[in-house]
Each structure stands twice: as C-alpha cells, then as structure tokens.
Amino acid sequence: MKALILVGGFGTRLRPLTLTLPKPLVEFGNRPMILHQVESLAAAGVTDIVLAVNYRPDVMVAALKKYEEQYNVRIEFSVESEPLGTAGPLKLAEKILGKDDSPFFVLNSDIICDYPFKQLAEFHKKHGDEGTIVVTKVDEPSKYGVVVHKPNHPSRIDRFVEKPVEFVGNRINAGIYILNPSVLKRIELRPTSIEQETFPAICSDGQLHSFDLEGFWMDVGQPKDFLTGTCLYLTSLAKRNSKLLAPNSEPYVYGGNVMVDPSAKIGKNCRIGPNVVIGPNVVVGDGVRLQRCVLLENSKVKDHAWIKSTIVGWNSSVGKWARLENVTVLGDDVTIADEVYVNGGSILPHKSIKQNIDVPAIIM
C-alpha cells in the first residue's frame, strides 16, 4: 500500500519552534511528530510513503531516511517548487500513487490520533467507491466545515457545510483519507484544494464516504493545540498502561500522565504532572513544579521553578523561582532569568529574558 503525507510549508502557527526545525520534526511525545504517522502506516502494511514538502526538504531527507530500514518502508520526497495546496501534491506524486490499482492514504502531518489505517482500508474496500474521509465528532461544529450525509445512508456524504450557523451535524473532516487512484484524474497540477474542489466533485458523483474515528484526535499545528494534543496522547497511553509513561509510584509523579526520557535528570522534592513530557538530557532541579507542559531536549529547569501550559524549547534554561504559564513557548536556546514571570510569551530563539512579561507577547 501507499501513502502521501502533506507536510507543507513554513509551519508559521507553531513558531518559534519551527524557526529551528520543520514542523514534522518537532518532537511530540519525545519523537518527531511525523514518526507517529510513519510508524502507524508501516504497521498497517504501507510500504511506500511520499512526503509532500516545500520547506527545507534537505533537513527532512537527512532526518527521515534513517527510518526506512527501521520500519521497512520506502520514504520518497515530492518537493514542490511552489506551494500546491492540499490536492496539487497528489498530482505531483502521481507516478508513485498511481503506479497500480490499489488505494492510497492521504493525511495532514499536523494530525495526532489513534490512527485507524487498517480498519479504514477494510471499510473503503467494502463499500467499493472512490474515496473515504475519516471524520471526528466535535462539540462546537459551527467552528468547522461539517460533513452532511445523504438521507437513509449512514456513510455516503451528501455535501459539506462550512461553519454552519444552524446545526446540520457534528462530524468534521479529520484530515485523513483513503482514495482510489482514479481520483488523480480529477486533479490538475496547480495549487488546488482537496477539501474545496476535489471532494465536492467526488461527492456530487455519490462516490465519497465517511469513516468515524474512535478515540482522541487533535490538529497540533499551534502551541495551544500542541499542549492539548499532548494531554490527549498521554491519556490514551495511560488507558493502555503504556510503558512509555513513568510509573505513578515514582516520587515525583503527581496526578499521572508523565513521560520522562531515560536520560533526563530530576531533582529532589519535585511535583510533576499531570500531562508532562520531559525530553532527552533535560535537567530538572530540586522543588520544581511542572504541569501540562513539554520540556524539549537539553533544556534545564532550575530549583523551585513553576511551569504550566508551556513548551520549553531545546537548549533553553528556566531560572530559579521563575514562573511560566498561559501558553508560553520558548524557542531554541532561550534563557529565562531567576524569579522572572512569563504570562504567555512567545520568545524567539537565543533571547535572554530578565524582566517579567505580564501580558502575552512575542519577544523578538
């Protein structure tokens, strides 16, 4: 089987982290974000994976080629000379995606969930039509494009309603699809949208179905959602009693859902959790309080610091008695001085912060 991952461009929504690494390589749950998808695709029997990229492809190639042997897959890069939207990349990769009659998966690289690739392939084969979209239920459908089904048919899609004022349904496009190669004939090699152009055309021919996603789902393309997605991911691991989580018997674990890389060092009298990820070679001092946060590789948190709803970037340092909260994001190599308060700052790489940031701000 084949798959195309829409990696896309600059990852501006996840800055300042994406100023250092392309978004798919930013660690989510202590692994590059895209590796969660590659691993799940390989487990479902996918052998050919195409990454559609238009930003720093050289970095992506160097980072991901080593995983081919590990997962027994071929990873190829389809490099766009100009951004081609969400449908154009399929046409650009037509030689691979259309090389045989078997269907192929398409997914957005920002999506973290319990990937249902095997079940999705079985469902798609069973109905025999041209395409299947994975959908997820949301509490506030008025914020999204909603999938509406044909009367008396539970899966065949009738139409899409963008940000409906009146309730028409609560299922939204989850950014994961399986399509027959015939779909490629519907797409031109130009910047084009699969959601706004390709899917409505398949829909009008009665050839598009939906597949309900069970379990958690999150688009983690911006810091607030990255943190929420981390909580959902850790909760999912806890339900499966995953060995990736620190046991609750550890003296520093407070409230559960804590992931700690084996190379990290944690001081005395710390309270960590719930929903914390601590990366490789991180050093946490004594008496530190961490909750709902991510500490990326080589970062350092000094004694008695208090951190909540924050992403601490690679090689960054948080001073003694400092307090960070309210979706604060530190880029690479940021230094927060002792006793400094940061209330929602987005701080670009290599900055040194010696004064309080009382209201959310971008520090350049």
Swiss-Prot record:
One of its GO terms (molecular function) is mannose-1-phosphate guanylyltransferase (GTP) activity. It comes from the Eukaryota. Keywords: Cell cycle, Cytoplasm, GTP-binding, Nucleotide-binding, Nucleotidyltransferase, Transferase. Pathway: Nucleotide-sugar biosynthesis; GDP-alpha-D-mannose biosynthesis; GDP-alpha-D-mannose from alpha-D-mannose 1-phosphate (GTP route): step 1/1. It is found in: Cytoplasm. PROSITE patterns: HEXAPEP_TRANSFERASES (PS00101). InterPro entries: GMPPB_C, GMPPB_N, Hexapep_transf_CS, Mannose-1P_guanyltransferase, NTP_transferase_dom, Nucleotide-diphossugar_trans. GO terms for biological process: GDP-mannose biosynthetic process; protein glycosylation; spore wall biogenesis. Its EC number is 2.7.7.13. Belongs to the transferase hexapeptide repeat family. Involved in cell wall synthesis where it is required for glycosylation. Involved in cell cycle progression through cell-size checkpoint. This is Mannose-1-phosphate guanyltransferase. The lineage of its organism: Eukaryota, Fungi, Dikarya, Ascomycota, Pezizomycotina. The gene is mpg1.
